[in-house]
């Protein structure tokens, strides 16, 4: 078993998984690092528009989960964008409209998972 006390860092027992718009990812990562939270960033895509998103992982003690979520809440905001109808996946190939559709974009989704085992090498 690895001795975690030698690092001086509290042992993480929660994995905070944050899925955010790539528009907000850089600022979120900077704020988390400034708060001394460990960060791993992975590019991803998702949502019904298949736009770029980023998944950020941070292993923290349970006592710090609310602080991490507060940073996500401060940085990641939903926005409204006008999108051409042709780009919507649920519209047929022959669809055409001169008027774009307003769609909610961005924001974030947070999952908090228990860590059963943690090892640092």
Predicted regions and their residues:
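Positively charged, small/polar-rich N-terminal and surface patches that mediate targeting and assembly
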Residues: 1-121
């Amino acid at each position: 078993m690895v001795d975690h006390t030698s690092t001086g860092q509290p042992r993480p027992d929660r994995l905070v998984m944050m899925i955010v718009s790539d528009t907000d990812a850089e600022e979120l990562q900077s704020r988390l690092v400034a708060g001394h939270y460990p960060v791993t960033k992975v590019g991803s895509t998702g949502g019904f528009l298949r736009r770029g998103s980023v998944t950020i992982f941070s292993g923290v003690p349970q006592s710090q989960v609310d602080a991490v979520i507060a940073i996500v809440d401060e940085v990641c905001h939903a926005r409204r964008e006008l999108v051409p109808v042709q780009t919507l996946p649920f519209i047929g190939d022959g669809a055409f409209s001169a008027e774009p559709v307003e769609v909610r974009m961005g924001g974030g989704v947070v999952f908090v998972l228990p860590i059963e085992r943690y090892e640092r090498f």
